[in-house]
């Protein structure tokens, strides 16, 4: 889905091991393209196809865009969806976070944003971020990796090329942390990563 028509502007999906699926999407509630009226919503579908919870995750006048979702294991039999989206609040860019179980219930113990996980209160993760796929033996919350693109300017100040970066979410003893950014790849001159 490319978000070109209708009020749904972005759509991503994930599935828990039991077959419960979730779709997350940004919704243009203005129907005029006013990005301050974009909201993030999600819905669940049981393994047998029964529709589950449909919920707005945001309802504000801030930019909320680029919803992402991944299924992660939070412990022995505790599988949940992790939702993330780019937001701009009071001029500050951040990645908002939400953990939701298969029944659609939001967690009240999961951090609300990446900036809440850093000592400085700032997380320099680009708005075009993605969650890396989790599968097999690497589905733990400690395997959750966020990937994004940063641009490098040339000597004249014009955008020249991109660098792909990643950071890993860590959980231990009731504390969530975000690793320092790691450079995955620097693209050649005059090359940008539109899709990764």
What are these regions (language model features)?
Residues 1-196:
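Extracellular, repeat-based ectodomains that mediate carbohydrate processing or recognition
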């Amino acid at each position: 889905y490319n978000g070109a028509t209708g009020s749904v502007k972005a759509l991503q999906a994930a599935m828990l091991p039991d077959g419960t699926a979730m779709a997350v999407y940004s919704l243009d509630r203005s129907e005029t393209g006013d990005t301050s009226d974009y909201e993030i919503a999600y819905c669940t579908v049981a393994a047998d196809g029964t529709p589950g919870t449909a919920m707005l995750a945001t309802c504000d006048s801030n930019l909320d865009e680029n919803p992402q979702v991944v299924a992660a294991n939070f412990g022995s039999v505790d599988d949940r969806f992790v939702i993330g989206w780019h937001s701009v609040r009071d001029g500050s860019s951040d990645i908002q976070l939400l953990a939701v179980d298969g029944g659609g219930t939001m967690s009240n113990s999961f951090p609300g944003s990446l900036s809440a996980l850093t000592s400085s209160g700032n997380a320099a993760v680009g708005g075009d971020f993605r969650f890396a796929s989790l599968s097999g033996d690497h589905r733990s919350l400690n395997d959750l990796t966020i990937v994004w693109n940063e641009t490098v300017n040339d000597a004249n100040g014009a955008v020249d090329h991109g660098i792909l970066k990643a950071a890993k979410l860590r959980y231990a003893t009731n504390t969530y942390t975000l690793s320092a950014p790691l450079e995955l790849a620097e693209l050649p001159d005059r090359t940008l990563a539109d899709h990764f």
